[in-house]
Amino acid sequence: MNVAIIPARGGSKRIPRKNVKEFCGKPMIGWSIEAALKSDCVDKVVVSTDDPEIAEVALKFGAEVPFIRPGSLSDDFTGTTPVIKHAVEALTADLNETSLICCLYATAPFVTSEDLKRGLEKLVTSGSDFVFSVTSYAFPIQRAIRINSEDRIEMVNREHFNTRSQDLAEAWHDAGQFYWGTTDAWLGERVIFGLGSSPVILPRHRVQDIDTPEDWLRAELLFKALQS
Protein backbone atom coordinates (compact mmCIF):
# COMPACT_ATOMS: atom_id res chain seq x y z
CA MET A 1 0.00 0.00 0.00
CA ASN A 2 1.25 3.46 -0.95
CA VAL A 3 0.12 6.42 1.12
CA ALA A 4 0.23 10.17 0.63
CA ILE A 5 0.59 11.99 3.95
CA ILE A 6 -0.22 15.70 4.01
CA PRO A 7 1.12 17.55 7.08
CA ALA A 8 -1.17 20.48 7.87
CA ARG A 9 -1.04 22.11 11.27
CA GLY A 10 -3.38 24.90 12.27
CA GLY A 11 -0.88 27.38 13.70
CA SER A 12 0.50 29.12 10.62
CA LYS A 13 1.64 32.61 11.59
CA ARG A 14 2.54 34.69 8.53
CA ILE A 15 -0.59 33.65 6.62
CA PRO A 16 -3.19 32.75 9.27
CA ARG A 17 -5.19 29.59 8.48
CA LYS A 18 -3.37 29.26 5.17
CA ASN A 19 -3.97 25.52 4.84
CA VAL A 20 -7.73 26.10 4.58
CA LYS A 21 -7.71 29.65 3.22
CA GLU A 22 -9.49 29.87 -0.13
CA PHE A 23 -7.09 29.71 -3.05
CA CYS A 24 -8.55 30.15 -6.53
CA GLY A 25 -11.91 28.71 -5.61
CA LYS A 26 -11.21 26.05 -3.01
CA PRO A 27 -9.39 25.61 0.31
CA MET A 28 -5.65 25.46 -0.27
CA ILE A 29 -5.29 21.90 1.03
CA GLY A 30 -8.00 20.77 -1.39
CA TRP A 31 -5.66 21.14 -4.37
CA SER A 32 -3.09 18.75 -2.89
CA ILE A 33 -5.70 16.20 -1.84
CA GLU A 34 -7.30 16.18 -5.28
CA ALA A 35 -3.96 15.81 -7.08
CA ALA A 36 -3.06 12.82 -4.91
CA LEU A 37 -6.44 11.13 -5.34
CA LYS A 38 -6.35 11.60 -9.12
CA SER A 39 -2.82 10.24 -9.45
CA ASP A 40 -3.82 6.58 -9.01
CA CYS A 41 -0.44 5.95 -7.42
CA VAL A 42 -1.55 6.09 -3.78
CA ASP A 43 -4.08 3.88 -2.05
CA LYS A 44 -5.07 6.49 0.49
CA VAL A 45 -4.49 10.13 1.34
CA VAL A 46 -3.98 10.87 5.03
CA VAL A 47 -3.87 14.34 6.58
CA SER A 48 -1.80 14.81 9.73
CA THR A 49 -3.25 17.75 11.62
CA ASP A 50 -3.88 19.11 15.09
CA ASP A 51 -6.74 21.29 13.89
CA PRO A 52 -10.48 20.34 13.78
CA GLU A 53 -11.30 22.68 10.88
CA ILE A 54 -8.45 21.34 8.75
CA ALA A 55 -9.59 17.80 9.56
CA GLU A 56 -13.15 18.64 8.50
CA VAL A 57 -12.03 20.15 5.20
CA ALA A 58 -9.69 17.21 4.53
CA LEU A 59 -12.52 14.73 5.00
CA LYS A 60 -14.76 16.75 2.69
CA PHE A 61 -12.20 16.47 -0.10
CA GLY A 62 -11.79 12.72 0.32
CA ALA A 63 -8.77 12.39 2.57
CA GLU A 64 -8.64 10.39 5.78
CA VAL A 65 -7.84 11.75 9.23
CA PRO A 66 -7.31 8.61 11.32
CA PHE A 67 -5.51 10.40 14.16
CA ILE A 68 -4.98 13.86 15.61
CA ARG A 69 -1.39 15.03 15.61
CA PRO A 70 -0.07 15.63 19.15
CA GLY A 71 0.79 19.15 20.24
CA SER A 72 4.43 18.19 20.68
CA LEU A 73 4.65 17.80 16.89
CA SER A 74 2.58 20.87 16.04
CA ASP A 75 4.71 23.77 17.23
CA ASP A 76 6.75 26.29 15.23
CA PHE A 77 9.98 24.32 15.61
CA THR A 78 9.13 20.75 14.61
CA GLY A 79 10.37 19.73 11.17
CA THR A 80 8.52 17.69 8.60
CA THR A 81 10.44 14.44 9.02
CA PRO A 82 9.34 13.65 12.60
CA VAL A 83 5.75 14.51 11.63
CA ILE A 84 5.82 11.99 8.78
CA LYS A 85 7.54 9.43 10.99
CA HIS A 86 4.74 9.80 13.53
CA ALA A 87 2.12 9.33 10.82
CA VAL A 88 3.85 6.23 9.44
CA GLU A 89 4.01 4.74 12.93
CA ALA A 90 0.30 5.49 13.41
CA LEU A 91 -0.49 3.72 10.13
CA THR A 92 1.67 0.65 10.81
CA ALA A 93 -1.28 -1.75 10.68
CA ASP A 94 -2.07 -0.64 7.11
CA LEU A 95 1.50 -0.78 5.79
CA ASN A 96 3.86 -3.53 4.72
CA GLU A 97 7.55 -3.80 3.86
CA THR A 98 6.94 -2.63 0.28
CA SER A 99 4.81 0.39 1.20
CA LEU A 100 5.99 3.73 -0.16
CA ILE A 101 5.14 7.05 1.45
CA CYS A 102 4.66 10.43 -0.20
CA CYS A 103 4.88 13.52 1.97
CA LEU A 104 2.78 16.05 0.07
CA TYR A 105 2.61 19.63 1.29
CA ALA A 106 -0.78 21.21 1.87
CA THR A 107 0.38 24.41 0.18
CA ALA A 108 1.28 22.88 -3.18
CA PRO A 109 -1.47 23.98 -5.58
CA PHE A 110 0.85 23.64 -8.58
CA VAL A 111 1.52 19.93 -8.01
CA THR A 112 0.05 17.60 -10.61
CA SER A 113 -0.92 13.95 -10.61
CA GLU A 114 1.72 13.37 -13.28
CA ASP A 115 4.41 14.86 -11.04
CA LEU A 116 3.47 12.43 -8.29
CA LYS A 117 3.55 9.49 -10.71
CA ARG A 118 6.99 10.52 -11.95
CA GLY A 119 8.20 10.66 -8.37
CA LEU A 120 6.91 7.20 -7.54
CA GLU A 121 8.35 5.68 -10.70
CA LYS A 122 11.77 7.18 -9.99
CA LEU A 123 11.74 5.98 -6.39
CA VAL A 124 11.00 2.44 -7.55
CA THR A 125 13.59 2.39 -10.34
CA SER A 126 16.42 4.39 -8.75
CA GLY A 127 16.85 2.52 -5.50
CA SER A 128 16.91 5.86 -3.66
CA ASP A 129 15.71 6.47 -0.12
CA PHE A 130 13.85 9.58 -1.26
CA VAL A 131 12.74 11.27 -4.47
CA PHE A 132 11.54 14.85 -4.26
CA SER A 133 10.65 17.82 -6.45
CA VAL A 134 13.35 20.36 -7.31
CA THR A 135 13.73 23.32 -9.63
CA SER A 136 16.66 25.43 -10.79
CA TYR A 137 17.68 28.80 -9.40
CA ALA A 138 16.82 31.62 -11.78
CA PHE A 139 20.15 33.34 -11.06
CA PRO A 140 23.62 31.85 -10.46
CA ILE A 141 23.98 31.36 -6.72
CA GLN A 142 27.76 31.78 -7.04
CA ARG A 143 27.16 35.47 -7.78
CA ALA A 144 24.94 36.07 -4.75
CA ILE A 145 25.44 39.24 -2.70
CA ARG A 146 24.65 40.19 0.87
CA ILE A 147 24.03 43.49 2.64
CA ASN A 148 26.29 43.94 5.65
CA SER A 149 25.60 45.70 8.95
CA GLU A 150 26.78 49.00 7.47
CA ASP A 151 24.31 48.79 4.57
CA ARG A 152 27.07 47.96 2.12
CA ILE A 153 27.20 45.26 -0.54
CA GLU A 154 29.46 42.22 -0.31
CA MET A 155 29.71 39.24 -2.65
CA VAL A 156 29.25 35.88 -0.99
CA ASN A 157 31.77 34.35 -3.42
CA ARG A 158 33.95 37.19 -4.64
CA GLU A 159 36.10 34.85 -6.72
CA HIS A 160 33.21 34.66 -9.20
CA PHE A 161 32.91 38.43 -9.78
CA ASN A 162 34.32 38.11 -13.30
CA THR A 163 33.03 34.62 -14.08
CA ARG A 164 30.50 34.44 -16.88
CA SER A 165 27.10 33.10 -15.87
CA GLN A 166 27.27 30.37 -18.51
CA ASP A 167 30.51 29.10 -16.97
CA LEU A 168 28.98 28.55 -13.54
CA ALA A 169 27.46 25.23 -12.51
CA GLU A 170 23.67 25.21 -12.41
CA ALA A 171 22.22 24.97 -8.92
CA TRP A 172 18.91 23.57 -7.76
CA HIS A 173 16.62 23.95 -4.77
CA ASP A 174 13.82 22.06 -3.11
CA ALA A 175 10.52 22.88 -4.83
CA GLY A 176 8.55 22.35 -1.62
CA GLN A 177 5.86 20.14 -3.13
CA PHE A 178 6.33 16.40 -2.53
CA TYR A 179 8.81 13.89 -1.10
CA TRP A 180 8.46 10.20 -1.90
CA GLY A 181 10.33 7.87 0.43
CA THR A 182 10.54 4.29 1.56
CA THR A 183 8.92 3.37 4.85
CA ASP A 184 12.33 2.54 6.33
CA ALA A 185 13.75 5.90 5.23
CA TRP A 186 10.98 7.84 6.96
CA LEU A 187 11.05 5.72 10.11
CA GLY A 188 14.84 6.01 10.25
CA GLU A 189 14.65 9.80 9.72
CA ARG A 190 17.31 9.52 7.04
CA VAL A 191 18.77 12.65 5.45
CA ILE A 192 16.59 13.88 2.59
CA PHE A 193 19.01 16.42 1.12
CA GLY A 194 21.82 13.99 0.43
CA LEU A 195 23.23 11.28 -1.81
CA GLY A 196 20.43 8.89 -0.89
CA SER A 197 17.93 11.05 -2.77
CA SER A 198 17.08 11.64 -6.43
CA PRO A 199 15.26 14.59 -8.05
CA VAL A 200 12.09 15.14 -10.02
CA ILE A 201 12.80 18.34 -11.94
CA LEU A 202 9.96 20.85 -12.25
CA PRO A 203 9.90 24.01 -14.39
CA ARG A 204 10.37 27.22 -12.42
CA HIS A 205 6.99 28.59 -13.51
CA ARG A 206 5.26 25.83 -11.52
CA VAL A 207 7.14 26.43 -8.29
CA GLN A 208 6.23 29.10 -5.74
CA ASP A 209 6.88 29.28 -2.00
CA ILE A 210 3.76 30.42 -0.18
CA ASP A 211 4.99 31.78 3.14
CA THR A 212 3.95 35.46 3.06
CA PRO A 213 0.94 37.46 1.81
CA GLU A 214 3.07 38.60 -1.13
CA ASP A 215 3.86 34.96 -1.97
CA TRP A 216 0.16 34.17 -1.82
CA LEU A 217 -0.78 36.95 -4.22
CA ARG A 218 1.96 35.96 -6.66
CA ALA A 219 0.88 32.31 -6.50
CA GLU A 220 -2.74 33.20 -7.24
CA LEU A 221 -1.77 35.34 -10.22
CA LEU A 222 0.51 32.63 -11.58
CA PHE A 223 -2.06 29.90 -11.01
CA LYS A 224 -4.76 31.84 -12.84
CA ALA A 225 -2.39 32.54 -15.72
CA LEU A 226 -1.56 28.85 -16.07
CA GLN A 227 -5.25 27.92 -16.00
CA SER A 228 -6.25 30.40 -18.71
What are the residue ranges of the model-derived segments?
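Hydrophobic helical membrane-anchoring modules
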Residues: 199-201, 206-228
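Short phosphate-binding loop-to-helix
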Residues: 53-101, 111-114, 118
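Catalytic metal- and UDP-sugar-binding loop of GT-A-like glycosyltransferases, i.e.
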Residues: 104
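N-terminal glycine-rich phosphate-binding loop and ensuing alpha1 helix
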Residues: 2-48
